[in-house]
């Protein structure tokens, strides 16, 4: 019947889409991760004076914690682990603080690298972290 044919076409379409996405997973992961990190670094660069003041050591302690919460949210959107070698909560917290340290270093050293380059560095850091956390899967 027609409903069965339509269902079969839909199932085949889903299978093709799933295969296409699985073939492009690494490329998509790289692209989305670099874009997300570049967006963050571009925003910071556009607001250089503001962030320089925040990271000068005399700013409110609550800013780093709030900023870390924001970074965790961005990272969780980009990364889904398969099998955790360490508990996910510990891993994502450590990665977010490490990434915040990268931003701090970039800002306090005069933002010499372009935001796009920092986005690449962010991708490299995250991709290596994902390899480690999913080792053995």
What are these regions (language model features)?
Residues 18-49:
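Hydrophobic alpha-helical connector segments
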Residues 9-13, 33-36, 63, 67, ...:
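Hydrophobic/aromatic residues within well-ordered alpha-helical segments
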Residues 9-20, 47, 70-78, 129, ...:
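A short secondary-structure junction motif
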Residues 52-54, 115:
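Short, hydrophobic secondary-structure boundary micro-motifs
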Residues 86-109, 113-129:
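Hydrophobic alpha-helical segments that form the core
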Residues 58-82, 86-97, 131:
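Amphipathic alpha-helical packing segments from all-alpha helical-bundle domains
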Residues 1-7, 11:
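HTH DNA-binding helix-turn interface
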Residues 41, 68, 72, 119-127:
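Hydrophobic core segments within long, regular secondary-structure runs in both alpha-
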């Amino acid at each position: 019947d027609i409903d069965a044919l339509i269902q079969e076409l839909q199932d085949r379409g889903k299978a093709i889409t799933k295969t296409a996405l699985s073939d492009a997973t690494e490329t998509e992961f790289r692209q989305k991760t670099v874009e997300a990190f570049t967006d963050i670094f571009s925003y910071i660069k556009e607001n250089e004076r503001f962030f320089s003041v925040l990271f000068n050591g005399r700013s409110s302690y609550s800013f780093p914690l709030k900023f870390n919460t924001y970074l965790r949210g961005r990272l969780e959107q980009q990364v889904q682990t398969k099998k955790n070698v360490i508990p996910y909560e510990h891993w994502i917290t450590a990665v977010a603080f490490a990434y915040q340290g990268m931003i701090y270093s970039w800002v306090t050293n005069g933002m010499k690298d372009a935001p796009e380059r920092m986005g690449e560095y962010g991708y490299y850091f995250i991709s290596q972290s994902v390899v480690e956390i999913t080792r053995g899967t």
